[in-house]
Structures are given as structure tokens and as C-alpha cells.
């Protein structure tokens, strides 16, 4: 369900673009993101900082698109968001000696420091690359191609990257212990 909530604005943006065009789709994306934040606030009582940033970016760049009637601003929005996320990881690591990936995921798994650093740097590089790829697609191809890339290409690249991260992390995952194998002989039924 959380995944559907996360993708709600982009799916509505895609559908609205196909039916009504970029400007209506932009307004729909803004409204859907506001609705998403309201739902999360009511349902969970708390909004993650990145969700607030995402709302701010869509309101600013979507609003600029609607006010100027220039689709350029909405096309920059994913790049700005990717670069803000990558920049936060980079600044956290370099200036504050804080690994934000570890902060976000540390309670879910135990990894050596080197693995946490590798994950932080790989996510930083991934976000930088995604921002650059978005700019390239936005300016080298039609708006229709960019919208298709935004939904299918962006999500596809993210899925491939996450699978790669999972494969990398799998070497650090401990095998679950079988209690029957490790129990003393006299304790077995």
C-alpha cells in the first residue's frame, strides 16, 4: 500500500498528461502531492522530511510551469529533487561525518562501516546520475518521451539499482540460525 501511496502523484501525472496535456498534468501532480501529504499526516501523524521537500519542489516548479506556461520548469523538477537528495547524502558524509543512509536504514540491518560508506556513495552517485539523465531526456527528446521516461524509465532504473544494492548487501546478511540444529541434544523433544 505504501508503494502505491508513494507513486500516486506520478501515476496521476502520467494519466493526466496522456488525456489532457502537460499543464493539466502539472496541476494534477501538485494536487495529488498535497493530497498525499494530507493523507500521510492524517494516517500516520508524521511526514518524512524528504516528503516535505518533494512537496516544496513540486509546488515551486509546478507552479512556475503553470504561471509561465513553460513546461521547462516541470521537466527540471525530478533533477532538482534527485540532486537535493544526492546533495544531502554528500554534505552529510563530507561535512558532518554523518552517513544518512545508515541513519535511515541502520535499525533494519547490521553492516560494517565500509559497507555503509559504499551504500552512501553509491546512492549519492545514483541520484547525481538520475538528475543528469532526466535533464538529457527532458531536453533531447519530446515531452511525451520525457513523461514516459519519468514513469517507466525512472522507476525501472531505480528498481535495477535497488536490486543491485540488494545483491551487494546479500554478502553481509547473516544466515538465520535453525534452533533445532543448535539446541543441545537433551533439549530436543
From Swiss-Prot:
Organism: Paracidovorax citrulli (strain AAC00-1) (Acidovorax citrulli)
Similarity-based family: Belongs to the YciB family.
Annotated Gene Ontology cellular component terms: plasma membrane
Membrane-topology annotation of the record: Multi-pass membrane protein
Compartmental location: Cell inner membrane
Disulfide bond entries: none
Function: Plays a role in cell envelope biogenesis, maintenance of cell envelope integrity and membrane homeostasis.
This protein's UniProt keywords: Cell inner membrane, Cell membrane, Membrane, Transmembrane, Transmembrane helix
Transmembrane residue ranges: 3-23, 47-67, 76-96, 121-141, 149-169
Major subcellular site: membrane
Protein name: Inner membrane-spanning protein YciB
Pfam families: IspA
Xref: InterPro entries: YciB (IPR006008)
Source domain of life: Bacteria
Keyword Acyltransferase: no
Amino acid at each position: 500500500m505504501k508503494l502505491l501511496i508513494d507513486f500516486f502523484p506520478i501515476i496521476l501525472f502520467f494519466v493526466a498528461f496522456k488525456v489532457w496535456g502537460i499543464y493539466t498534468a502539472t496541476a494534477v501532480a501538485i494536487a495529488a502531492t498535497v493530497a498525499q501529504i494530507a493523507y500521510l499526516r492524517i494516517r500516520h501523524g508524521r511526514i518524512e522530511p524528504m516528503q516535505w521537500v518533494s512537496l516544496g519542489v513540486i509546488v515551486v516548479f509546478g507552479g512556475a510551469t503553470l504561471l509561465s506556461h513553460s513546461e521547462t520548469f516541470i521537466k527540471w523538477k525530478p533533477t532538482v529533487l534527485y540532486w537535493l537528495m544526492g546533495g544531502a547524502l554528500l554534505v552529510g558524509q563530507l561535512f558532518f561525518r554523518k552517513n544518512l543512509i545508515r541513519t535511515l536504514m541502520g535499525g533494519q540491518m547490521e553492516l560494517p562501516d565500509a559497507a555503509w560508506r559504499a551504500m552512501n556513495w553509491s546512492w549519492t552517485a545514483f541520484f547525481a546520475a538520475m538528475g543528469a539523465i532526466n535533464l538529457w531526456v527532458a531536453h533531447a527528446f519530446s515531452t511525451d518521451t520525457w513523461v514516459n521516461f519519468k514513469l517507466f524509465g525512472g522507476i525501472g532504473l531505480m528498481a535495477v539499482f535497488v536490486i543491485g544494492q540488494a545483491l551487494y548487501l546479500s554478502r553481509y546478511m547473516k544466515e538465520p540460525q535453525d534452533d533445532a540444529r543448535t539446541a543441545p541434544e537433551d533439549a530436543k523433544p
